[in-house]
């Protein structure tokens, strides 16, 4: 690529600046910047005496077209070639350097000399150009380096503008499988593709100039109905950087800590109005926004619930560290810190709203963002969800790539959702008509191979899946011992929980007739292998007994956040009896506290009579003396029993009516009456 193309790429095209009579000069300088600036325009049509020291006079300005092309050919990768200057120009420069203005001539002679010099210069430069064409083999490596530099410039421009051309993904997206694209974090981008820009932005355009906001954000757009933003005391700091990863943590200042303590008191009071009062003084307190959003969602006010989540997301994004990147996939947030959990939960709830809104591509990008914050531990277990979002977004290539890159060290095939979603992605990819025939055939074969392995490893998935899809299997399948009722009953409880989670979330993806016919073919293939005594069947049975003895805590946390009834019903009793708060469900057992909650001197005085009565009936109720002995170290168990208290109070208030009580009459205030 020539230098002129690079100038156009940078927005520095020639011919856009005002031209003067003396501006049309061809000057060869050592510095590129000096060459692009050019001389200052003169006042007259004739060149003054001092101007002759800087360039050559050009009478016909159209001759500069060929001259610029030749000038670009003299430069390869920012270095000038070893060709010499034309004799007329070099001798003229030497003469002017030695003799000053002694070379001035009459106008007629100068015109003839100028035309002859131009013809000689153009002829010599053409010869040099032909020689350079013959030397392309020598400069091949340098030209390839130049193309790589151009690719880097294009990637930098695309990253800064948030725009990428259709086609193969850029090099930066191939560096990491959790690479996040900025433009896909905006749901309007996906809605524009579905409904058009006029339908999406038609009502938003008149409101754009009503208010000025302090910062441009990627995750959400501030609204004019929100309170004016002021720093709530939330910030982010860089803990350390090692092995190419940067570890960050959110911080609370003293003002925000006071708001956090008031929030915990409001939660213990079981009164949502107390949280509303707190938001009037601290409108961008994240945990209060999360808790109030759940209350609005339970009351089926989805619009208000989503608005509160977006406000919490905006508050946390404004506190980002300058080095914190959403797209690189190399920034980490430790979930063991309570300050960081709010960001995880806010992203998860925003992702859930986007999926329900009909934006699976944007929800997939949020899922990758959450997974990139701590991919090794995966505190919210996003690997149980990312396959579902990829299939809904019809991004089959990404799901296949994630499976191929992570199967070796994460054993994704041992999760029922990946075991069934990946072959489904291969099959749906084989149904596309814009791919070559050999790729379609290869995808179909891989899909059949993987679905047979999934049915062999998880036979208890088939019959519930057919029941969800309202499909009645034939007698050979339903009566066979491998897929019969014993297959679902004999599987471990932890595996049954994963199966219930997957089927409750993704069963509708299997309802197409083409998918069902393909599944039926492979079911019969598996039955033939079972009847033939394939050793892989027994190996899978032994593996199920060893791997799925008990689900880890992050899977239980994911099931609670998913709110899928079938999966929640399969939770063990030790999880369901714990206190589960919406702003911090199932906190880690090794929580890292940066500050502790101050001890309350009289906690009994802050509760209403009904709450105190039921609190005294709880098994974990403690007196004031026992509370003093526990101290602040009992912070992780401060919410024990609050969930059961909430259910008990709601049940009692639902059955308690003041109208059922008989009001005494005024003429008989003491309630005395006749017994007859």
Curated annotation (Swiss-Prot):
**Is Amino-acid biosynthesis one of the keywords?**
no
Q: Which GO terms describe its cellular component?
A: cytosol; nucleus; RQC complex
**Disordered: region residues:** 1-145
- So which tissues is this one expressed in? Broadly expressed in the embryo during the early stages of organogenesis with highest levels in dorsal root ganglia and little or no expression in liver and skin.
GO MF term set: DNA binding
User: So where does this one cross the membrane?
Assistant: none
- PANTHER family the record matches: NULP1-RELATED, RIBOSOME QUALITY CONTROL COMPLEX SUBUNIT TCF25
- Self-association state and partner proteins as the record states: Component of the ribosome quality control complex (RQC), composed of the E3 ubiquitin ligase LTN1, TCF25 and NEMF associated with the 60S ribosomal subunit. Interacts (via C-terminus) with NFATC4; the interaction leads to suppresson of NFATC4 transcription factor activity and is reduced following stimulation with angiotensin-2. Interacts with XIAP.
What family does the database annotate? Belongs to the TCF25 family.
Q: What is this protein called?
A: Ribosome quality control complex subunit TCF25
| Source species | Mus musculus (Mouse)
């Amino acid at each position: 690529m020539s230098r002129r193309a690079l100038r156009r790429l940078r927005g520095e095209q020639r011919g856009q600046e005002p031209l003067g009579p003396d501006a049309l000069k061809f000057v060869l300088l050592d510095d590129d910047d000096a060459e692009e600036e050019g001389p200052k325009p003169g006042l007259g049509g004739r060149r003054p005496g001092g101007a002759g020291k800087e360039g050559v006079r050009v009478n016909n300005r159209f001759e500069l077209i060929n001259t610029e092309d030749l000038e670009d050919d003299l430069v390869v990768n920012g270095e000038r070639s070893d060709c010499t200057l034309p004799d007329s120009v070099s001798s003229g420069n030497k003469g002017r350097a030695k003799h000053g203005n002694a070379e001035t001539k009459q106008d007629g002679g100068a015109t003839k000399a100028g035309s002859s010099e131009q013809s000689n210069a153009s002829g010599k430069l053409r010869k040099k150009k032909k020689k350079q064409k013959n030397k392309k083999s020598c400069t091949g490596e340098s030209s390839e380096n130049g193309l790589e530099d151009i690719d880097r410039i294009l990637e930098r421009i695309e990253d800064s503008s948030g725009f990428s051309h259709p086609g193969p993904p850029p090099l930066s997206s191939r560096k990491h499988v959790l690479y996040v694209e900025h433009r896909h974090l905006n749901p309007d981008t996906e809605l524009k593709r579905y409904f058009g820009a006029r339908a999406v932005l038609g009502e938003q355009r008149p409101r754009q100039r009503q208010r000025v906001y302090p910062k441009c954000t990627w995750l959400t757009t501030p609204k004019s109905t929100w309170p004016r933003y002021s720093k709530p005391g939330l910030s982010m700091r860089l803990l350390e950087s090692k092995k190419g990863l940067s570890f960050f943590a959110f911080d609370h200042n003293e003002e925000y800590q006071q708001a956090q303590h008031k929030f915990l008191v409001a939660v213990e009071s079981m009164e949502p109005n107390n949280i509303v009062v707190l938001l009037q003084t601290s409108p961008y307190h994240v945990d209060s926004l999360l808790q109030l959003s759940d209350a609005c969602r339970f009351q089926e006010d989805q619009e208000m619930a989503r608005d509160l989540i977006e406000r919490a997301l905006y508050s946390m994004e404004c506190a980002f560290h300058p080095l914190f990147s959403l797209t690189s996939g190399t920034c980490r947030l430790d979930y063991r810190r309570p300050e960081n959990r709010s960001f995880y939960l806010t992203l998860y709830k925003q992702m859930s709203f986007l999926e329900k809104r009909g934006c699976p591509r944007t929800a997939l990008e949020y899922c990758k963002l959450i997974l990139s914050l701590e991919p090794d531990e995966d505190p919210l277990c996003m690997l149980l969800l990312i396959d579902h979002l990829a299939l809904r977004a019809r991004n089959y290539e990404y799901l296949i790539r994630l499976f191929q890159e992570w199967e070796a060290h994460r054993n994704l095939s041992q999760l029922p959702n990946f075991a069934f979603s990946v072959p489904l992605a291969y099959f749906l990819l084989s149904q596309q008509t814009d791919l070559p025939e050999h790729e379609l055939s290869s995808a179909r074969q891989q899909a059949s191979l993987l679905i047979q392995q999934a049915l062999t490893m998880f036979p208890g998935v088939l019959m519930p899946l057919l029941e969800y899809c309202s499909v009645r299997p034939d007698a050979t399948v339903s009566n066979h011992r491998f897929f019969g009722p014993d297959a679902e009953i004999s599987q471990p409880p932890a595996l049954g929980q994963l199966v219930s989670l997957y089927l409750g979330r993704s069963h509708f993806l299997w309802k197409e007739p083409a998918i069902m016919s393909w599944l039926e073919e492979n079911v019969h293939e598996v039955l033939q292998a079972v009847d033939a005594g394939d050793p892989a069947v027994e190996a899978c049975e032994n593996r199920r007994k060893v791997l799925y003895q008990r689900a880890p805590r992050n899977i239980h946390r994911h099931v609670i956040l998913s709110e899928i009834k079938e999966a929640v019903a399969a939770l063990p009793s030790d999880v369901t009896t714990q206190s589960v708060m919406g702003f911090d469900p199932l906190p880690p057992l090794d929580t890292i506290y940066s500050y502790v909650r101050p001890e309350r001197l009289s906690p009994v005085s802050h509760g209403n009579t009904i709450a105190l009565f039921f609190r005294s009936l709880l098994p974990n109720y403690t007196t004031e003396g026992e509370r003093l002995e526990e101290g602040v170290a009992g912070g992780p168990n401060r919410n024990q029993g609050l969930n059961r208290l909430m259910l008990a109070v709601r049940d009692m208030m639902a059955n308690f009516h003041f109208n059922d009580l008989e009001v005494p009459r005024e003429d008989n205030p003491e309630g005395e009456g006749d017994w007859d």
